[in-house]
Amino acid sequence: NLAVGSHLVCLPGTHSKWVGVRDGRIQRIATAMTGELYAVLRQHSILGRLMPVDDTRFDAFAFDAGLRRSEQAGGMLHHLFGVRTAGLFQQIAEPALPSYLSGLLIGHELRASGAFSQKPRPAQVHLVGNDRLLASYAHALTSLGIGVQRHPEDLAAHGLHALWSRRSATRSNADV
């Protein structure tokens, strides 16, 4: 229940959403193109040529290395070039490169969301989405010492329906 207190909700996907909620009211929304950027880099860049076609295998060690790299100086563009270097010099095995790239991008997304520089830092993030995406985000958040509560992907549709119903009811009452 998000009706009382401050909460942070993440809806990972092609365009991930970060929603700050206080006492049941949306305070802020931030969007990141993490999923789309991952797909573009995998399918249409020199990085994708270094990786296997099938990227369904999750390598926790490589993912964590990407998360750690995202914390370091240099910025995301420099870090992305480092993915190429790691692949060319076999510092990270080819099958693990997609997990490394994913960890790097998600790590940058977490930091860019601004939620983790707040004081106090959120103790928990509500994750809404499919199990595969939630697993990566849950892994990243728990590695940062932040708890997660998972919610099914249809929760977002239910929430939008509730907002629409409330809006429609408000308009109907205003017409009276």
Name what the model sees in each region:
Residues Q149-V176:
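Glycine-rich phosphate-binding/hydrolytic loop that grips phosphoryl groups
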Residues R69-L110:
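Adenine-nucleotide phosphate-binding core of ATP-dependent small-molecule kinases
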Residues K17-V19, G114-A115, L134-A138:
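Short active-site-adjacent structural elements
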Residues N1-L8, P12, K17-R69, A73:
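Glycine-rich phosphate-binding loop plus the immediately following alpha-helix
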Residues Q27-A32, L144-D154:
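Short hydrophobic/aromatic-enriched beta-strand-loop microsegments
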Residues L110-R121:
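Phosphate/pyrophosphate-binding loops at sites that engage ATP/ADP/AMP, CoA/4′-phosphopantetheine
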Residues P122-A140:
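Glycine-rich phosphate-binding loops at beta-strand->alpha-helix junctions
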